[in-house]
């Protein structure tokens, strides 16, 4: 009987752990690229600060740069 109770608790914990893993996955990979509005803001901020390089780093996106030439023109 003890083995059965321990086994059931183990299965319940395993199911809870698997459910917790599934809920965390979409949060980590929520958004990879900024929207057009976020790029427009990044480009406007860059131009306001005197940067005329035609690319701007989008806020909150580590490795993504917006092509300001396409957005502004």
From Swiss-Prot:
Domain of life of the source: Eukaryota
Keyword Signal: yes
Comment on protein domains: Has the structural arrangement of an alpha-helix connected to a beta-sheet by disulfide bonds (CS-alpha/beta). Since the toxin contains only 2 disulfide bonds, it is called 2ds-CSalpha/beta.
Protein name: U-scoloptoxin(15)-Sm2a
Sequence similarity: Belongs to the scoloptoxin-15 family.
Biological function: Activity unknown, even that a lot of targets (Kv, Nav, Cav) have been tested and activities on insects and mice have been tested.
GO molecular function, one term: toxin activity
First-listed, main subcellular location of the protein, grouped into a coarse class: secreted
Reported tissue expression: Expressed by the venom gland.
Organism name: Scolopendra morsitans
């Amino acid at each position: 009987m003890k083995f059965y109770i321990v086994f059931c608790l183990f299965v319940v914990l395993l199911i809870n752990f698997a459910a917790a893993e599934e809920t965390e996955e979409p949060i980590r990979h929520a958004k990879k690229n900024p929207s057009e509005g976020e790029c427009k803001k990044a480009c406007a901020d860059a131009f306001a600060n005197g940067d005329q390089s035609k690319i701007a780093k989008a806020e909150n996106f580590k490795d993504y740069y917006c092509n300001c030439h396409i957005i502004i023109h």
